[in-house]
Amino acid sequence: MNASDVQTTQFFARRRFLGGTAATLAVGICEAFPVSSAGADPAGLNVLGPRAGYSPQIGAFVSELMWMREANGVLSATKGLSQADLDYLLDKNANTIGALMLHLAATETYYQMNTFDGIKWDSWSAEIKRKWDAPMELGDAGRQSIKGHDRDYYVNILHEVREKTLAEFRKRDDAWLLTVDKDWPWGGGPTNNHCKWFHVCEHEAHHTGQIALLRKRLPGAKPSSE
């Protein structure tokens, strides 16, 4: 996997109401207001920006992360699929749709441990590796072990992992998001927490495209114009 280069997300101007009088805040770091106010949520998933309960930049990123999941990601791509569909193997080198769903949960879990718990990449405990290495690495191990589950099984795991991510984001500020990891093992040099989590977001887009292709190749699948 290659981490994508990202530029720092620009802050959004926020409006804070004091005693019924609206005061427009300047765009900027806004260190005096490290957590977005309850009125910061825009009306609708398709309006990206700060979110209540998060620092400004983290909230803006959370809106992107949730848009990917809720509007255009793995949930919509797998809607209505049966267990047989999720277990279908296109060829001997392919991954099943179910395995790709669990792969997204595994990836997010490993980034949680690295960025929230400060665990060096690939130094997880044996217990964690037994649980997550097969869906993380996929290949033969994934093909052999990830099967026999309905869609709810995978969706519930994705939801559980995401809820932990959001809870941890609420505990952190924009300075944490921009913290640089000089010892990052791949991607050509240092990175920061923002880039790591941007990868988690775009990683779902990448595999959602694979899932869409696999869905079109399912036995009995109807032709699609997309």
Where do the PLM segments sit?
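N-terminal secretory signal peptides
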Residues: 1-12
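Bacterial N-terminal signal peptides
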Residues: 24-28
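Extracellular-facing binding/remodeling surfaces
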Residues: 79-85
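Second-shell loop/turn segments in exported
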Residues: 57-64, 86-88, 144-153
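Short, contiguous alpha-helical
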Residues: 11-13, 19-22, 36, 41-53, ...
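Acidic/histidine-rich alpha-helical segments that form the ligand environment
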Residues: 134-180, 195-200
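Extracytoplasmic/secreted proteins, especially bacterial periplasmic and envelope-associated proteins
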Residues: 61, 69, 73, 99, ...
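C-terminal segment of classical bacterial N-terminal signal peptides
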Residues: 29-35
